[in-house]
């Protein structure tokens, strides 16, 4: 005899989670959400390219993330990602095609749009986020941060008044778009 709970192994909760997820992605609301995620990423890439002269790998995106080549900005991805983090903007440092730098200190930065789309943000807010990213980058390009060791950079960038100002503005934006948990 086969009884419920004796079949499927110790991961029935994972199987149930997959089932719920598959049901959710089969709705018109999810399709609309997924399309907005891509629109937001495309808008972010376009803003960074056209207004702030960032080099976006492949010239744009057709998915949920933007991969930025920072070689023309003279700021390593690891440093920029940490500065963005202190400003309240989540990103990852990332290698880029043909990167000459090591994986722990690469030339690229990856940023995605699912979280902000989940909050309800659209193109108008993306325009502001791109502006903040450029402001943070300009702070990272200041002479005082050139040639600095990462452990020292982490401390100094956290104390930067402009980074703190941007973090407050980011927080205010997020408060307008609370997570519905």
Predicted regions: what they are:
Residues 23, 43, 47, 91, ...:
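Short alpha-helical interface elements
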Residues 39-40, 103-181:
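PLP-dependent enzyme catalytic core of the Aspartate aminotransferase-like
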Residues 1-76, 158:
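Active-site C-terminal subdomain of aminotransferase-like
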Residues 4, 24-27, 72, 86-90, ...:
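Short, well-ordered loop/turn and helix-capping segments at boundaries between secondary-structure elements
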Residues 55-123:
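Conserved PLP-binding catalytic core of the aspartate aminotransferase-like
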Residues 35, 82, 127:
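Short alpha-helical basic/polar micro-motif
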């Amino acid at each position: 005899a086969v009884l419920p709970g004796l079949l499927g192994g110790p991961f029935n909760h994972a199987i149930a989670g997959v089932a719920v997820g598959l049901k959710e992605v089969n709705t018109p609301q999810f399709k609309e959400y997924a399309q907005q995620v891509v629109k937001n990423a495309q808008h972010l890439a376009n803003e960074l390219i056209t207004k702030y002269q960032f080099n976006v790998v492949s010239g744009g995106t057709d998915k949920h993330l933007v991969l930025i080549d920072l070689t023309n900005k003279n700021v390593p991805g690891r440093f920029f990602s940490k500065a963005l983090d202190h400003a309240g903007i989540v990103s990852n440092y990332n290698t880029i095609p043909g990167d000459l730098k090591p994986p722990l200190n690469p030339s690229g930065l990856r940023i995605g749009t699912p979280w902000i789309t989940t909050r309800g943000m659209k193109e108008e807010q993306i325009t502001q986020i791109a502006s903040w990213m450029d402001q943070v980058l300009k702070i990272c390009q200041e002479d005082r941060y050139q040639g600095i060791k990462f452990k020292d950079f982490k401390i100094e960038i956290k104390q930067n008044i402009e980074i703190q100002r941007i973090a407050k503005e980011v927080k205010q934006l997020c408060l307008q778009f609370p997570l519905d948990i």
